[in-house]
Amino acid sequence: MADPRVPSSYNVTPRIRYNTVGGVNGPLVILDNVKFPRYNEIVTLTLPDGTQRSGQVLEARGNRAVVQVFEGTSGIDVKKTKVEFTGESLKLGVSEDMLGRIFDGSGRAIDKGPKVLAEEYLDINGSPINPYAREYPQEMISTGISAIDTMNSIARGQKIPIFSAAGLPHNEIAAQICRQAGLVQRQGITNKGVHDGHEENFSIVFGAMGVNLETARFFTRDFEENGSLGRTTLFLNLANDPTIERIITPRLALTTAEYYAYQLEKHVLVILTDLSSYCDALREVSAAREEVPGRRGFPGYMYTDLSTIYERAGRVAGRNGSITQIPILTMPNDDITHPIPDLTGYITEGQIFVDRGLHNRGIYPPINVLPSLSRLMKSAIGEGMTRKDHGDVSNQLYAKYAIGRDAAAMKAVVGEEALSNEDKLSLEFLDKFERSFIAQGPYESRTIFESLDLAWSLLRIYRKDMLNRIPKKIIDEFYSRSAADRKGKGKDKPTTKDTRDTAAPEEENLIDA
């Protein structure tokens, strides 16, 4: 049976069949006496029982080739296994029909649906984008999460990772983003084409690497139950799947996203989890090739390899579509200096930090905004995009939250009696900020306008003269707004209400305070 990932036109080309497997080492097969092997060329291996596996040439040196086998090397007989070189790199058949479908880590459909009729076959390694053709990421993608939208806004075309750790709810956050993510239509826009700003033109590509069966079921069930599966394409590589398959899973997801963005002109959000599993697979292949290890055993080229994934986000001139990446990685031992988050931070444009301390206090989502950063936030917010007070409110929230954390640390040393009235006010803001602004229900979606109004209700704890990060004209316009005025702002915006009904009285109390 021919490999479904390789076009049928390649299968009729006469090929040389080799029976020269020299050895097997982990996920690698060493071939001897082969003619003109090429780097990244796809290889078909036929086992004695007739089953076929596919692999990719990792190293070609003279008449010797090293091949990584995607389905694993167990059961390969060195003397009886036959090998064919296809002459092509790995390609993925893409189509708009892939929306709403679930694939495994090798690109094969696993949802019992009909076969996808490919409209194009694209190289999974992508094509280099001319830097001059790249457009600066602008306009905001809404996640419905206040801590992200208000203080770490994500621009269309940005790449921003989520730094998490074992035992933290990064899977729940990823599922919530997939449920709630959408476009914030830029006000007054007339020259971006009919596609821009339309909700039906927003799609999600979700790639999971090395997840267990329970996590895979959680994502598929969640997407099916809330109705977001219709705009989502899933690639699932499970923990019991071959490790080497994790090398190609994110590339399959990004190839699909590039087709949606640049051919169908959709705005695509790509969520990849868990990049730590991907890097572990990279280390395993490097060890099998007996390469000189780098920091903590990871290969020295891991920075370059990660960049081939992250740099496929962005926008291209002449196309209305965009690719926004949110890769998720788990930091071993909560260590942000580990090579994986360290190198990721050099390539990407910020990070969203999931904090264990907030999680232990029962706050969901436990996003610590102080170490979090969005380097392209300034191009995604402001008048005409979100609201003119957005940037100033964000700066003031950062300042007051940092002061509140300092006051909490001082209270632990000297006690509450030694604190000044201003310190006690900062402690009050700290508690309400974490309990009512950062915290929200897993099925609660807040528009950016609702999040900004909630932020103002918190800032009213302070007198006007204490808000030193906001210009006076902004304070005069937004500080004294009544609750009725604020509630009328986001009526035309769709929201998913769950815990917001219980949060409304608390918001009124904050205004009174």
UniProtKB/Swiss-Prot annotation:
Gene3D superfamilies: 3.40.50.12240. The keyword Nucleotide-binding applies. Residues 484-513 are annotated as: Disordered. Coiled coil: none annotated. Its main location: membrane. It holds the Pfam family ATP-synt_ab. SUPFAM superfamilies: P-loop containing nucleoside triphosphate hydrolases (SSF52540). One of its GO terms (biological process) is vacuolar acidification. The keyword Plastid does not apply. It is a peripheral membrane protein. InterPro entries: ATP-synt_VA_C, ATPase_a/bsu_AS, ATPase_F1/V1/A1_a/bsu_N, ATPase_F1/V1/A1_a/bsu_nucl-bd, ATPase_V1-cplx_bsu, P-loop_NTPase, V-ATPase_su_B/beta. HAMAP family: ATP_synth_B_arch. V-ATPase is a heteromultimeric enzyme composed of a peripheral catalytic V1 complex (components A to H) attached to an integral membrane V0 proton pore complex (components: a, c, c', c'', d, e, f and VOA1). Belongs to the ATPase alpha/beta chains family. This is V-type proton ATPase subunit B. It comes from Neurospora crassa (strain ATCC 24698 / 74-OR23-1A / CBS 708.71 / DSM 1257 / FGSC 987). The gene is vma-2.
